[in-house]
């Protein structure tokens, strides 16, 4: 039984203005041992940066490429910059089973990512769904976080439901023939 799909690297050969080395981390999905080889892709630039570590978490339907204009500016300010591809996006593996698509699973993946890379002095840069996820991270280990920038994010609070228009937008992204094969 196939649990996920891996996008061939040739799909990214014509990407412009994104000449950063791609790294992969695995063994950070807790829902089943069957996902032990599931890979999360990320770029990690200026690893010796002295100003802190910017961790960029994108939203729908984009990937780490979203941060291509921010990365050189942050490097110039001597930040280490990590831009990851959430599961299902960019160079990360694409889950195929519904069991994977739980908020708490994505959240745990992000926490393990931070832990495995031993990140500290983190400044989160959060976009859309990345903001919804990322805003829950500092409460787990506040000492490693130094700040955050959040834009175009849905702030879930368990009191109000997600709007139907937002759900329709997400559904359109998931069901779009143009996005299915990415």
Predicted regions and their residues:
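Short acidic-hydrophobic surface loop/beta-edge motif
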Residues: 23-33
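Short amphipathic alpha-helix adjacent to the substrate-entry channel of hydrolases
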Residues: 65-82
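Flexible "cap/lid" subdomain of the alpha/beta-hydrolase fold that forms the substrate-access gate
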Residues: 2-24, 40-48, 53, 60, ...
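Short, mixed charged/polar active-site loops
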Residues: 35-39
